[in-house]
UniProtKB/Swiss-Prot annotation:
GO BP annotations, alphabetical order: beta-lactam antibiotic catabolic process; response to antibiotic
E.C. designation(s): 3.5.2.6
Name of this protein: Beta-lactamase
Tagged with keyword Hydrolase: yes
Database matches in InterPro entries: Beta-lactam/transpept-like (IPR012338), Beta-lactam_cat (IPR045155), Beta-lactam_class-A (IPR000871)
Originating species: Serratia fonticola
Regulation of activity: Inhibited by clavulanic acid, sulbactam and tazobactam.
Length: 267
């Protein structure tokens, strides 16, 4: 995009942020030319449930060399259930496979499913280790669900930057970070997400195909990371992170939708 269009986008994002009363982070990668639009692109934001993509990707990476891994069944105890378990709570008798935990984690943001994946991997630090192996030096996962969502301003735990997450998401969903079957599986799970309708998707034309993962936490933290297939354009990768100064602030999915609309308006 020409310089004046880019400046205009920055100005619109700045306006949006000012009117929202929070802190907004945006990173768009246009894979047509790998150009980036960044707004607070290198600042740290709490990831909340957007971190689930990296956890599931770490599992998918393991499954490249262990073809039975995703069929492995793990039990679910009553004591495993946390604050949000829409799928896991229905399977206390049978348990679930790692594939089922992965789908529940990405498509329903089931927190018990995420914790089961973390348990299998050996803890949050293993997800950080995986991020390093795909070239992401910024991502850090420190805690399990639901404490990873405390989103305390200035706390570096469970944070990344919009730019780092966008690059990793591009590598995982469109690049070579995962082998082809695993990459395709991640994309399929993200395209089937049920939680993103009011976030990035709401700011895009309805004909565009989207795969995304939302996140939310304290301080009105409202997040979405997406791979986008526009009607007549190369894929886009978009990260929108938003957090607020008051611990009990309301979620603002509308801010994410507005940011998505601003950065894709010229396409």
């Amino acid at each position: 995009q020409p310089a004046n269009a880019k400046a205009n986008i920055q100005q619109q994002l700045s306006e949006l942020e000012k009117n929202s009363g929070g802190r907004l982070g945006v990173a768009l990668i246009d894979t047509a030319d790998n150009s980036q639009i960044l707004y607070r692109g290198d600042e740290r934001f709490p990831m909340c449930s957007t971190s689930k993509v990296m956890a599931v990707s770490a599992l998918l990476k393991q499954s490249e060399t262990d073809k039975n891994l995703l069929a492995k069944r793990m039990e679910i105890k009553q004591s495993d259930l946390v604050n949000y378990n829409p799928i896991a709570e229905k399977h206390l008798d049978t348990g679930m496979t790692l594939a089922e935990f992965s789908a529940a984690t990405i498509q329903y943001s089931d927190n018990t499913a995420m914790n089961k994946i973390l348990e299998h991997l050996g803890g949050p630090a293993k997800v950080t280790e995986f991020a390093r192996t795909i070239g992401d030096k910024t991502f850090r996962l420190d805690r399990t669900e639901p404490t990873l969502n405390t989103a305390i301003p200035g706390d570096k735990r469970d944070t990344t930057s919009p730019q780092a997450m966008a690059i990793s998401l591009q590598n995982l969903t469109l690049g070579k970070a995962l082998a082809e079957p695993q990459r395709a599986q991640l994309v399929e799970w993200m395209k089937g997400n049920t939680t993103g309708g009011a976030s990035i998707r709401a700011g895009l034309p309805t004909t565009w195909v989207v795969g995304d993962k939302t996140g939310s936490g304290d301080y009105g933290t409202t997040n979405d990371i997406a791979v986008i297939w526009p009607a007549n354009h190369a894929p886009l990768v978009l990260v929108t992170y938003f957090t607020q100064p008051q611990q009990n602030a309301e979620a603002r999915k509308d801010v994410l939708a507005a940011a998505a609309k601003i950065v894709t308006a010229g396409l």
